[in-house]
């Protein structure tokens, strides 16, 4: 009897060793794992996992920087048991990273590149502050960086989010992030990418692309950028890209449908036009509907009968097979279904050749070049890019001023407060023109919302018709015509209808009449130089405005010229002449040699009551003249008050800089000005008028008497400052106000009144006892000093 075999216990399963960081674990014999290829071949086999962004295209042209995945690194699709690391070492949070941040809101956009380390960043607030400083927006400015977004529109809310979200970010202030903002940021970051240039003009995907997308996505039940309940299905049908080629995993019904369409197409190609079966199948892909194309023909009531329509049908099918960038948003997919079905029905109708050429979208392109060279982009694709880019620039301006639902928006402008565009409210002197340049959009909107033009007399109509005749634009107007034209330009209802400035005058003509000297001031898009007339030797200030930096802000200069020409007062800077060339605009203005009041305050700190009374008197006289014409300055501050030193050693203030001035025909809701001098009704956004200038006059009077402003934030926090201003909380601190008269304090209280209806007007200030007593006393003393000299 044979011996029974000895039963040996099975060997215990080998405990898998922990994966070494530098080398992968050896593969198990007989098992084919994902790591049995060489590492050189492995890089070409890996498919990258990237969540689809809301619109980010994936064109053939390489980006200058790789747009990384949601965690800031390229993650191969390995199983969790694989010993290969899924995150590259160079994207480790511990290693310093170079990031690029784009700040939107101005032209040109601000872009900064920073080298950041995770260990050096303590808090997210510190990170935002550092980025804001690098972009040129200190933390006390109103348009500082408040939020960070990724290129996919996801908000960064913590330091850890920032260090795993990629290498490029979008910085925003209080304004919301829009799809247009993301597009502008992408064009700034990757200006040479062809896919970005084509993406805004190819939002409707081709039927071939639509057939690759999941059916649920085409129905519009899910969003493209969300990871919802269908994430497992999306992974099974994921679209993987490698070296510009697209491999797709289709559902069984979609694959059968595509194979049937390919067989029908191959059978129809030798004979000419595609077969009706193939055409109807293609229609099913294009429209994304369940019924067949034959049913579409029946419901449309039109049948393909002529050869011309067959050729157009073939042309349409050839266009539909063209690839489209994969960055089309899901909202556009939903809108494209109805539009594509309408195009198919319209293509079947028997049209004349002239009508066939007028089709829109892709039907307007020629299909022969598409079929002849499907891989190389034809010239017809490149040509619309330059034109469409120009249209896009104009469109962005029109979108700012005319959003969707234009009638309703215009009604809102008249009846209620519009959406406030945050503009910089700067208290530094070198940036005094920033607020004006940032608010060009709302200036245009408000000017467009002005009331209709007042009826003109017959004489004015004849004069206007005579000036519209050809040949009168390039000639010099007579002084009488100039005065009549200025009278017409005083009307607030015609800010953009001002007669054109003299044309055909080049820079040499300006230099022919004036000797141009050195620079005495500058702003965002203008430089002020001293000049002297060659014949009269009279000194003037020449404001030279660069038109290349003024694109989209022309109305600001036109409004400023219009208002200055309508004003004539000894306490207001006069405009002498206006010249315009192809490159620049020249404003020849009165030259005040004593500097501005800001310099005088820095030099003297504070002024005696008589001198302060004279300065406030000059300011209020100018404001009386302006307010009588319903013109509000909106930027009254020491920097805009020029000091003229007279021969009798007295001074005269002249109001200047009318870039924010505006005719008041209804309450204004635009937030603008300078923080220290801004009125509370501007901040409350409930509508304001002429009274805001008097609040600023009260702040200036307070500074003249004690040397510091009435409203201050110890931490220089602008939000805190605005809250203090809205409450109207100020006090006469001791010992600075101990020697100031009660009459002066009473005038300050009446000017710094929160209620605009109770606030003093300019005429009431001139009638105040302190002004009449102290101001006249100072004037009498100056006259007595002048009499012995004479």
UniProtKB/Swiss-Prot annotation:
<keyword id="KW-0808">Transferase</keyword>
<dbReference type="InterPro" id="IPR017441">
    <property type="entry name" value="Protein_kinase_ATP_BS"/>
</dbReference>
<dbReference type="InterPro" id="IPR000719">
    <property type="entry name" value="Prot_kinase_dom"/>
</dbReference>
<feature type="compositionally biased region" description="Pro residues">
    <location>
        <begin position="7"/>
        <end position="29"/>
    </location>
</feature>
<dbReference type="Pfam" id="PF00069">
    <property type="entry name" value="Pkinase"/>
</dbReference>
<protein>
    <recommendedName>
        <fullName>Serine/threonine-protein kinase DCLK3</fullName>
        <ecNumber>2.7.11.1</ecNumber>
    </recommendedName>
</protein>
<dbReference type="InterPro" id="IPR036572">
    <property type="entry name" value="Doublecortin_dom_sf"/>
</dbReference>
<keyword id="KW-0539">Nucleus</keyword>
<dbReference type="GO" id="GO:0005524">
    <property type="term" value="F:ATP binding"/>
</dbReference>
<dbReference type="InterPro" id="IPR003533">
    <property type="entry name" value="Doublecortin_dom"/>
</dbReference>
<dbReference type="GO" id="GO:0004674">
    <property type="term" value="F:protein serine/threonine kinase activity"/>
</dbReference>
<dbReference type="GO" id="GO:0106310">
    <property type="term" value="F:protein serine kinase activity"/>
</dbReference>
<dbReference type="GO" id="GO:0034504">
    <property type="term" value="P:protein localization to nucleus"/>
</dbReference>
<keyword id="KW-0547">Nucleotide-binding</keyword>
<dbReference type="InterPro" id="IPR011009">
    <property type="entry name" value="Kinase-like_dom_sf"/>
</dbReference>
<dbReference type="GO" id="GO:0004672">
    <property type="term" value="F:protein kinase activity"/>
</dbReference>
<comment type="similarity">
    <text>Belongs to the protein kinase superfamily. CAMK Ser/Thr protein kinase family. CaMK subfamily.</text>
</comment>
<feature type="region of interest" description="Disordered">
    <location>
        <begin position="201"/>
        <end position="290"/>
    </location>
</feature>
<feature type="domain" description="Doublecortin">
    <location>
        <begin position="97"/>
        <end position="183"/>
    </location>
</feature>
<dbReference type="GO" id="GO:0005737">
    <property type="term" value="C:cytoplasm"/>
</dbReference>
<feature type="compositionally biased region" description="Basic and acidic residues">
    <location>
        <begin position="457"/>
        <end position="496"/>
    </location>
</feature>
<keyword id="KW-0723">Serine/threonine-protein kinase</keyword>
<feature type="binding site">
    <location>
        <position position="543"/>
    </location>
    <ligand>
        <name>ATP</name>
    </ligand>
</feature>
<feature type="region of interest" description="Disordered">
    <location>
        <begin position="1"/>
        <end position="37"/>
    </location>
</feature>
<feature type="compositionally biased region" description="Low complexity">
    <location>
        <begin position="201"/>
        <end position="218"/>
    </location>
</feature>
<feature type="active site" description="Proton acceptor">
    <location>
        <position position="635"/>
    </location>
</feature>
<dbReference type="InterPro" id="IPR008271">
    <property type="entry name" value="Ser/Thr_kinase_AS"/>
</dbReference>
<feature type="binding site">
    <location>
        <begin position="520"/>
        <end position="528"/>
    </location>
    <ligand>
        <name>ATP</name>
    </ligand>
</feature>
<keyword id="KW-0963">Cytoplasm</keyword>
<feature type="compositionally biased region" description="Basic and acidic residues">
    <location>
        <begin position="332"/>
        <end position="345"/>
    </location>
</feature>
<keyword id="KW-0418">Kinase</keyword>
<dbReference type="Pfam" id="PF03607">
    <property type="entry name" value="DCX"/>
</dbReference>
<feature type="domain" description="Protein kinase">
    <location>
        <begin position="514"/>
        <end position="771"/>
    </location>
</feature>
<feature type="compositionally biased region" description="Basic and acidic residues">
    <location>
        <begin position="352"/>
        <end position="400"/>
    </location>
</feature>
<dbReference type="GO" id="GO:0035556">
    <property type="term" value="P:intracellular signal transduction"/>
</dbReference>
<dbReference type="GO" id="GO:0005634">
    <property type="term" value="C:nucleus"/>
</dbReference>
<keyword id="KW-0067">ATP-binding</keyword>
<dbReference type="GO" id="GO:1900181">
    <property type="term" value="P:negative regulation of protein localization to nucleus"/>
</dbReference>
<feature type="compositionally biased region" description="Basic and acidic residues">
    <location>
        <begin position="425"/>
        <end position="434"/>
    </location>
</feature>
<feature type="region of interest" description="Disordered">
    <location>
        <begin position="315"/>
        <end position="506"/>
    </location>
</feature>
């Amino acid at each position: 009897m044979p011996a029974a075999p000895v039963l040996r216990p099975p060997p215990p399963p080998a405990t898998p060793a922990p994966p070494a960081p530098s080398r992968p674990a050896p593969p198990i014999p007989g098992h084919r794992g994902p790591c049995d290829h060489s590492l050189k071949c492995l890089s070409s086999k890996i498919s990258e996992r990237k969540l689809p962004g809301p619109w980010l295209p994936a064109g053939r042209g390489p980006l200058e920087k790789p747009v990384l995945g949601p965690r800031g690194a390229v993650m191969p699709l390995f199983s969790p048991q694989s010993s290969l690391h899924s995150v590259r070492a160079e994207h480790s949070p511990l290693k310093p990273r170079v990031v690029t941040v784009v700040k939107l809101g101005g032209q040109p956009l601000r872009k900064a590149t920073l080298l950041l380390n995770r260990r050096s960043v303590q808090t997210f607030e510190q990170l935002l502050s550092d980025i804001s400083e690098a972009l040129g927006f200190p933390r006390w400015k109103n348009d500082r960086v408040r939020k960070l977004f990724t290129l996919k529109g996801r908000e960064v809310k913590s330091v850890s989010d920032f260090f795993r979200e990629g290498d490029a970010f979008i910085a925003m202030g209080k304004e919301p992030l829009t799809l247009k903002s993301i597009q502008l940021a992408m064009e700034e970051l990757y200006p040479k990418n062809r896919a970005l240039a084509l993406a805004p003009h190819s939002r409707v995907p081709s039927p071939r692309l639509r057939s690759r997308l999941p059916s649920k996505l085409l129905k519009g039940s899910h969003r493209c950028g969300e990871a919802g309940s269908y994430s497992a299905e999306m992974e099974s049908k994921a679209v993987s890209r490698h070296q510009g080629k697209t491999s797709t995993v289709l559902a069984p019904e979609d694959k059968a449908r595509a194979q049937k369409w390919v067989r029908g197409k191959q059978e129809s190609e030798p004979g000419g036009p595609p077969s009706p079966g193939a055409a109807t199948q293609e229609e099913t892909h294009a429209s994304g509907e369940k019924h067949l194309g034959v049913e579409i023909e029946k419901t449309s009531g039109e049948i393909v009968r002529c050869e011309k329509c067959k050729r157009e049908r073939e042309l349409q099918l050839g266009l539909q097979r063209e690839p489209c960038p994969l960055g089309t948003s899901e909202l556009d997919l939903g809108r494209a279904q109805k539009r594509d079905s309408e195009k198919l029905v319209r293509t079947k109708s028997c049209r004349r050749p002239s009508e066939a050429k007028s089709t829109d979208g892709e039907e307007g392109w020629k299909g022969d070049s598409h079929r002849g060279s499907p891989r190389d982009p034809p010239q017809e694709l490149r040509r619309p890019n330059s034109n469409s880019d120009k249209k896009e620039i104009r469109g962005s301006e029109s979108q700012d001023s005319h959003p969707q639902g234009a009638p309703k928006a215009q009604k809102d402008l008249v009846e209620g407060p519009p959406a406030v565009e945050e503009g910089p409210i700067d208290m530094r002197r070198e940036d005094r023109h920033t607020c004006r340049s940032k608010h060009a959009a709302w200036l245009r909107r408000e000017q467009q919302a002005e009331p209709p033009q007042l009826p003109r007399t017959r004489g004015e109509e004849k004069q206007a018709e005579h000036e519209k005749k050809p040949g009168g634009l390039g000639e010099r107007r007579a002084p009488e015509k100039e005065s009549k034209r200025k009278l017409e330009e005083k009307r607030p209802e015609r800010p953009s209808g001002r007669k054109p400035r003299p044309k055909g005058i080049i820079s040499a003509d300006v230099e022919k009449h004036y000797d141009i000297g050195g620079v005495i001031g500058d702003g965002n898009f203008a430089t002020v130089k001293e000049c002297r007339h060659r014949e009269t030797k009279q000194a003037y200030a020449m404001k030279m405005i660069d038109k290349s930096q003024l694109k989209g802000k022309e109305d600001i200069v036109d409004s400023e010229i219009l208002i200055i020409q309508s004003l004539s007062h000894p306490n207001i800077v006069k405009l002498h002449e206006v010249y315009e060339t192809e490159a620049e605009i020249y404003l020849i203005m009165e030259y005040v040699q004593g500097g501005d009041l800001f310099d005088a305050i820095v030099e003297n700190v504070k002024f005696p009551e008589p001198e302060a009374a004279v300065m406030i008197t000059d300011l209020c006289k100018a404001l009386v003249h302006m307010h009588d014409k319903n013109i509000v300055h909106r930027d009254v501050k020491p920097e805009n008050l020029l000091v003229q030193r007279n021969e009798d050693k007295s001074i005269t203030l002249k109001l200047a800089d009318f870039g924010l001035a505006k005719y008041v025909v209804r309450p204004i809701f635009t937030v603008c000005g300078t923080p220290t001098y801004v009125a509370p009704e501007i901040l409350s956004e409930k509508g304001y008028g002429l009274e805001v200038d008097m609040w600023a006059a009260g702040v200036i009077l307070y500074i003249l008497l004690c040397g510091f402003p009435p409203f201050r934030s110890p931490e220089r926090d602008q939000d805190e400052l605005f809250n203090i201003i809205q409450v109207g909380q100020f006090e006469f601190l001791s010992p600075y106000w101990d020697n100031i008269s009660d009459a002066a304090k009473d005038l300050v209280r009446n000017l710094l009144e929160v209620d605009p209806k109770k606030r003093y007007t300019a005429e009431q200030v001139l009638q105040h006892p302190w002004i009449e007593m102290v101001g006249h006393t100072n004037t009498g003393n100056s006259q007595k000093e002048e009499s012995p000299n004479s």
